[in-house]
Amino acid sequence: MQRTTMSYMVATILTLAAVSGISMQSSVQMAHAQLASPACGQVVKGNVTLTANLNCPGDGLIVGGDNTRIDLNGYSITGPGPDSSKVGIVVPNSDLVTVVGPGTVRNFQAGILVTGSDGTNVKRVTFDGNKIAVFMTGTTNTVVEQNLIGPNSIGVAAHSSDMVDVHANLMSSNSLAGVTFVNTDKSTVWANSIGGSANGIFLDSQSDKNSMKFNNVLGNTLDINNADGLALNINDNEFLKNNCNTSNPVGTCVGT
C-alpha cells in the first residue's frame, strides 16, 4: 500500500495510545457503583451479564477489577461514533478479564481498549463501525479469538504489547488494516480470515519475533506487509503457510 496510508495508520495507533489513557481516566471517574444490570459509563467487576442493549453517549463499560467476566448475552453496546474519544469496553490495569459474546460492540473510537493488563480474552464478539475494533497497549497474554470483525478502520491493533494471540477470527472490510502490530513482540496471528483492507497484516519495524501462520489473507491491497518491505531477518518475524497473493517483502505467501 502507499506509504502515506501506512504512515496514517501507524500515526492513528500512536495517537490513540496517547489519548486513550486520558479518556479512560475521565470515564472511570463517572461511576463507581456496580449494578445488577450494567449501564453506560458503569465501572463493573465480577460476573456481569447484559440484559438489554446499551446506547451510550459516552463510554460503555469500564472494568474495575481482576477476574471480571462480561457476557454480552446477545445484546449490543453502541457508541456515539468512531470519531469520538469514547470506548465500548475499557480494561485498565485489570488481569484475567473475559469479554464474551454473542453480542456486538459498535460505533466507538475503540470497541475494546485493553491497557496495562494481563490475560484478557475477547471471544465471539461482533465489532463494526469502530475506528479500531480491539486495541491493546502495554498488555501481555491478550487472546482475541473467534470474533467477527468488520467493517472498522482497523480490526485488531497491538501497541507495545507482548504475547498477543489472535486466532480464528473473521475480519472483513477493515479499511486500513485487519491486524496491525506496533512495537509488539513474541505474538502469534494464526488461522484467521482477513480481507478487504489496505493491509491484511501489518507489522512495523519495531515488532519482532512474531509468528504469522496458517492465515487466509486475500483480497487486500497488500495482504502481508512486514514493515514496508523490511527483510525478515532484521526483525525475526515468522511467516508460515499463509494463503495470500501479495506481500512486502515478497516470499511470505504460500507458493511465492
Where are these regions (language model features)?
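Leucine-rich solenoid repeat scaffolds
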Residues: 209-256
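Consensus "Asn ladder" position of solenoid repeat domains
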Residues: 102-103, 125, 130, 147, ...
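Structural detector of coil-to-beta-strand junctions
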Residues: 60-62, 86-90, 111-113, 131-134, ...
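N-terminal domain-start segments of secreted/luminal proteins
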Residues: 31-61
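Secretory targeting signatures
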Residues: 1-34, 50, 70, 122, ...
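Eukaryotic tandem repeat interaction scaffolds
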Residues: 154-190
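Small-residue (G/S/T/A) turn/hinge positions that recur once per unit in extracellular repeat modules
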Residues: 65-68, 75, 94-95, 117, ...
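Extracellular beta-strand-rich solenoid/capping regions of secreted or surface-exposed proteins
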Residues: 43, 55-70, 79-98, 106-118, ...
